[in-house]
Amino acid sequence: MTLVSSELVEGINQLLQVLTTALQQLRVHRAKTRVWGYNRLHDQLTAHAVKLADFQDALIARLLVMDAHVDLQNVGRLRIGQTVEDILASERGLALESVQLCQRLHETSRIDVFTRVLIEKLALSEDERLQSYDQSLELIRQLGTPQFLSTRC
């Protein structure tokens, strides 16, 4: 059994909750964009969901290696967008929450190197998504939704 701090286990489980919420929200958003015919956006959301699922699997594995409790019982509130702009904004919110949790976990004093590297990779990936959402939302503001959709989705 690995000696691990309860703060770290709690933090990883909080991160798992955010990822579980994000995956469920992405499931609905992917379906909506597919039905609406926005294939490029659908493909982007699908690629993001695959990455998140891989990170979720890796975090679960880390907890199991630590002989710690894996808590997947709680899913946060889903913020299902009714428009493409709403979808991007709600996905941005969860990406930001993930980045903030990763930063807090990274500062945990008793964190092993494998978990630290995993959290750094997740933070980097989510930060890239955050920048992508910010860029898309800014383009919507500048171009308007119809023009954005015709050129980007």
Residue ranges, per PLM feature:
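Iron-associated oxidoreductase/ferritin-like identity signal
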Residues: M1-C153
